[in-house]
Amino acid sequence: MAVVTMRQLLESGVHFGHQTRRWNPKMKRFLFTERNGIYIIDLQQSLSFIDRAYDFVKETVAHGGSIMFIGTKKQAQESIAEQARRVGMPFVNQRWLGGMLTNFQTVNKRIARMRELEQVDFDDVAGSGLTKKELLVLRREYDKLTKTLGGIREMTKVPSAVWIVDTNKEHLAVDEAKKLNIPVVAILDSNCDPDDVDYRIPGNDDAIRSVTLLTRVIADAVAEGLQVRHGGKSDAAEPLAAWEQDLLAGDEGVQSGGSESVATVEGSTAPEAAQAEAAEGQPAEAAAEAGDTAEAPVAGDEAPAEAAAQV
């Protein structure tokens, strides 16, 4: 059975790329067409790449490896933390500190400091032997460490591979992984460089539902790998969300062939393209040049009924 269906990818807006003026020519082979100034990603290729990445992550974890989940943009923060915690893997969803991989020995010392501060009762002025001001300074230090390092507190060595949402934003993490020859599994939007990624998944890295779906798929691969590692059943696999269950129940016979992908994409309406443009989180060209990413609306949330019917 396929890891994910074509219908799930379409409904999550995985096929929406960036505006045509913001693209990387190296991504041309992963693009299906262009419509209304928006690139449409070839989901038929995405399906095969998802299966390949899924198998790699599963085998890596089954042989004792670990996967670090990385995504600091607003659209990815919640799903990165939720899915990583579900399968007990390290994650970074707030800010990437330079040297988290290449200088892990120093980072590990900061983790030890965070654990040391956990033993302090910041409200016990009399028993601590410290003044209120000193306790306040320590509390602020602890809060800062928890925010940046809380997701990797149990990590004792560099990960076996990394899952990254938006390789452009997380370019420091990509560079560090490449220096250490750590395989990179990532979503490739139409403005990304595929040469930086070992296991590519062409797709939308701006829409919340797209990021959530693909991150859940990777987490499911980790869960299955853990099951193989321990030689037993695992209950870590997350049940489908209600909207995903409705999709599958409403169309059990949906085929994932290339002809369907072509027909569905060509039948999409202009409002969908507008949603895709909004999903980029770049309302203005100036914002795009500045690199700031606002929280994007979910692509496909309000897709016209006729688009669903075409699928």
Swiss-Prot record:
It comes from the Bacteria. Keywords: Ribonucleoprotein, Ribosomal protein. InterPro entries: Ribosomal_uS2, Ribosomal_uS2_bac/mit/plastid, Ribosomal_uS2_CS, Ribosomal_uS2_flav_dom_sf. Pfam families: Ribosomal_S2. GO terms for biological process: translation. One of its GO terms (cellular component) is cytosolic small ribosomal subunit. Residues 269-311 have a biased composition (Low complexity). PROSITE patterns: RIBOSOMAL_S2_1 (PS00962). Residues 251-311 are annotated as: Disordered. One of its GO terms (molecular function) is structural constituent of ribosome. Belongs to the universal ribosomal protein uS2 family. This is Small ribosomal subunit protein uS2. It comes from Kineococcus radiotolerans (strain ATCC BAA-149 / DSM 14245 / SRS30216). The lineage of its organism: Bacteria, Bacillati, Actinomycetota, Actinomycetes, Kineosporiales. The gene is rpsB.
